[in-house]
Design a protein with these regions (language model features):
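Gly/Pro-rich active-site capping loops and adjacent beta-alpha segments
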Residues: 1-46, 122-309
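Short, charged, surface-exposed loops that flank catalytic or proteolytic processing sites
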Residues: 58-67, 237
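Short, contiguous, pocket-lining structural segments
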Residues: 42-49, 60, 94
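Accessory "access/gating" subregions that flank catalytic or transport cores
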Residues: 70-151
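Amphipathic alpha-helical segments within well-ordered protein domains
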Residues: 54-55
């Protein structure tokens, strides 16, 4: 279909500062497809085209391929960098990154500067060569992602995700995000996914969006839940929320975090069961949050290889 050629065109210029370019793609129906969509469609196609063109240009100009790349990489001071309307639904905006630093580190790993010439034949007749390439990859596609968090009266924290894991490791990643954002030990957090009875809406797991979108949904839910926890605790303790701190799964008086806890998370969950009589809120200690985004975020990197054939 159109996914691979469209993605190839949208990222063809990669991490380079190209003021103006035009790209056309053509789709051809065939029953002898050379490659198919599996992971990151259009990414390796665009990288191969671009990086080979750079190598060819460097050879024509008689300069080092790495030097040509450094001369044309987008600089950190140019961030956020608007690459223009390279996709159907809007401009491509690189939000952050230090592309020259990434390439420098990759070259250091293979001793690029100390290796001259860059292509040679050793005493055994093997051909050696050094290759380098850089890339950017769009991730975090919206429009939204959701998470629901429920705290039991034993203090157990259950997190229900709108995304579904298929080996990506969301159970670990989302538990870490929840523990850090909410202020609880990671071992009391349990992650659930793939059940629309608990959270009916989700955007799906694809395009490296899980951590960006799902992680932000978990973080947002944790912030909402922490506000509720402090509100319940302050009402019960007859003080202001600003005078309390919630960390390590317990309530402390501000400035006395190393002292005895005033309330545990389980005790706060029990208070939440009587919430209507305490603060006029619905009973139960839980929250659902949806994170929305209309922009992509971009990862980046550089690869360097020493190959002998």
């Amino acid at each position: 279909g159109s996914l691979v050629p469209a993605s190839t065109a949208s990222l063809l210029m990669g991490p380079y500062n190209v003021p103006a370019y035009q790209c056309g793609v053509h789709c051809v129906m065939t029953n002898k497809t050379g490659v198919g969509t599996f992971r990151a469609p259009g990414r390796y196609e665009s990288c191969f085209i671009r990086e080979r063109l750079l190598d060819m240009a460097a050879a024509d100009l008689g300069i080092d391929p790495a030097e040509l790349r450094f001369k044309n990489l987008i600089q950190p001071s140019q961030m956020p960098y608007n690459a223009g309307r390279t996709r159907a639904d809007g401009d491509t905006v690189f939000d952050s990154g230090n592309y020259p630093q990434g390439l420098t580190k990759a070259l250091e790993q293979i001793g690029y500067e100390q290796t001259n010439p860059k292509r040679w034949i050793d005493d055994t007749g093997r051909y050696h060569g050094l290759g380098i390439a850089t890339y950017v990859k769009n991730t975090g596609r919206g429009p939204y992602e959701g998470a629901r968090i429920v705290v039991s009266d034993t203090g157990q924290v259950d997190v229900y995700l709108g995304i579904t894991t298929m080996g990506q490791g969301h159970e670990t990643t989302m538990a870490q995000i929840c523990a850090d954002s909410l202020g609880v030990p990671m071992d009391i957090v349990t992650i659930f996914h793939g059940n629309t009875d608990y959270i009916p809406f989700g955007g799906g797991t694809y395009g490296s969006r899980g951590t960006v979108m799902g992680g932000n949904a978990v973080h947002l839910a944790c912030q909402n839940l922490q506000e509720r926890i402090l509100s319940l605790a302050s009402t019960y303790l007859d003080t202001e929320p600003a005078n309390l701190v919630f960390q390590r799964g317990e309530i402390f008086r501000k400035g006395e975090e190393l002292g005895p806890a005033l309330l545990s998370l389980g005790e706060i969950a029990c208070l939440a069961a009587d919430a209507p009589s305490i603060e006029g809120e619905p009973p139960g200690l839980e929250t659902t949050a949806y994170f929305e985004s209309d922009q992509l975020t971009f990862s980046y990197g550089s690869h360097a290889a020493h190959v002998a054939v």
